[in-house]
Amino acid sequence: EGIEYLLKAAKYVKELPERNDVFWGIVGGGPDLERMKKLCHEMGLDDIVEFTGRVPDQKLLDYLNTADVCVNCDEYNAMNDKSTMNKVLEYMALGKPLVQFDLTEGRYSAQDASLYAEHNNANDMARKILELLDNPEKRKWMGEYGRNRVINELGWEHTSKALLEGYDRYFRSRGK
């Protein structure tokens, strides 16, 4: 899941006496939503965390456009380490800087559009989020970098040829 790490990061930030300026919006649904809301309440974070549940695409876009930093909190494990997370590319396409755990595929996709926290370390994730919140110029540069990477390197028009060639090789090797 990973939301637990984001809640732990929020708690870390809330406990810093000088930080009362960070609000956490968690958009999306899933089977663990009610459990995460309960955990949030138990951690005393109701005043700084909002769970929206699943929202229509336009509302999702509205939420993302108000974010200063986007977070991919998918935990480090063997599957996530090698999986492309659509949200990473969506954040980049919107010109948003992001923070995520240091996953192989996440680093390949985002490159300099992201700061990378130590594997499954919520406090390090919190520190990286604060680093970006405190540096608007860095956020702007990272957001532009990510958007340009999506447009110039990761868009379908750039990746479809390699994908189709891979399928072609696979089917030829199977005699089809």
How would you label these PLM feature ranges?
Residues K82, L103-Y116:
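Short acidic/histidine- and often glycine-rich active-site loop of Leloir-type glycosyltransferases
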